[in-house]
A protein has these predicted regions:
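Gram-negative bacterial Sec-dependent N-terminal signal peptides
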Residues: 1-22
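A compositional/structural signature for long, glycine/proline-rich flexible linkers
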Residues: 22-358
């Protein structure tokens, strides 16, 4: 099985050149006296986001250079390169030189499923989303800094491998320059170690982070602390206007036949909005072959609710996922109709637990 614990786009349910360095000399929050944010050699609190972003850029440019797509294969139990991998989309990634302008397009011809190009600048800002039927031109003036952008395109995996791969190839861009990306000189291990330091602060309860406040177009749109932790815990995550995540299914973990019955979400179907449930083993890796279900394949109860089942057979098997003891899940919602309404909806879901099927 192909596994890399810390690989491209550590996007979990967190929720979320010298010219590229943002002005990060902001007043620090009092929490830093409690959490360990001390420097790891050349990587520190002030430059970490740029170092992390540079690390992600280099994972692409070291393989294919600039202005070249890498189309990932769909996730499965035997093909998962990132912990808590996302099954409902396939990724296409690239680093593009926009120093003289570049245009990014997602066609809507022969393309009726969710698909976006997510554009990220060298400060892990901008977060521009290009949707089906749209073309967007980006120059350095549109960024918070730098001359290069990272593309993290997402194409809905509809279960038809050939069609999914066909739609990936519909993604396009044209760039007017192709200068090699100039790495910023950070040592890879220092970046990884500092990332783990910040993640450990969250996991041990030394700091609380609001992922939705860590992603924005400019520094004025983010909270300083959340911005830095978001880069560690969810680099490449989408802003809540495009996707929102439920970090766990309440009551998860037991291996008996159970049902999770929830109100159906309000998503923008015209933009291809949909939702899904993906399950994992206790170590965060996909553990079973039947680990994922799209919202449209859950059981419609006819009363405005849908049900997902776990380890159930018989007539419920087609709505059921296979799980092991101490399993966990992430629920993903794409293209919410209303951002705040969906945030409130997620809070409601946190109070709805799975129940044994009698």
């Amino acid at each position: 099985m192909k596994r890399t614990l810390l690989a491209l786009t550590l996007v979990t349910a967190f929720f979320g050149s010298h010219a590229a360095f943002a002005d990060t000399n902001s007043t620090r929050d009092p929490y830093i006296t409690e959490a360990d944010v001390s420097a790891v050699h050349g990587v520190n609190w002030d430059n970490y986001v740029q170092a992390e972003t540079d690390w992600n850029f280099r994972q692409v440019t070291d393989k294919v250079g600039v202005n070249q797509w890498i189309h990932d294969a769909p996730v499965s139990k035997d093909n998962q390169t990132v912990i808590r991998s996302n099954r409902d989309v396939v990724y296409s990634i690239a680093v593009v030189d926009v120093s003289k302008g570049a245009t990014f397009s997602v066609t809507d011809k022969n393309n009726d499923e969710f698909q976006i190009i997510h554009i990220i600048d060298e400060n892990h800002l901008t977060h521009k989303v290009v949707r089906r039927g749209e073309s967007v031109t980006i120059t350095p003036d549109d960024l918070s800094g730098g001359n290069y952008v990272y593309l993290l395109a997402r194409t809905k995996d509809n279960g038809n491998l050939a069609d999914t791969q066909r739609r990936q190839k519909l993604l396009s861009f044209t760039a007017n320059s192709a200068k090699p990306y100039p790495a910023k000189g950070f040592t890879e291990q220092d970046v990884v170690d500092y990332r783990l330091k910040l993640i450990n602060n969250v996991m041990t309860g030394k700091v609380t982070v609001e992922g939705v406040k860590g992603f924005g177009q400019t520094l004025n749109d983010v909270v300083d602390k959340d911005y830095r932790y978001a880069a560690a815990y969810g680099w490449g995550g989408l802003m809540p206007t495009t996707a929102q995540y439920l970090e766990a299914v309440p009551g998860q973990g037991a291996p008996e036949c159970q049902e999770w019955r929830i109100p159906q979400p309000k998503l923008n179907r015209e933009l291809g909005g949909y939702w899904s449930v993906t399950t994992y083993g206790p170590d965060g890796w996909i553990a079973k072959d039947k680990f994922y279900i799209a919202g449209e394949n859950t059981k419609d109860n006819g009363d405005g609710t849908s049900s997902v089942f776990f380890n159930c057979g018989g007539e419920l098997a087609k709505y059921s996922l296979d799980v092991m003891k101490n399993w966990a899940a992430i629920v993903r919602f794409y293209e919410p109709s209303d951002v705040q309404e969906t945030l409130d909806y997620l809070q409601t879901l946190r109070g709805i637990s799975v129940k044994p099927v009698q």
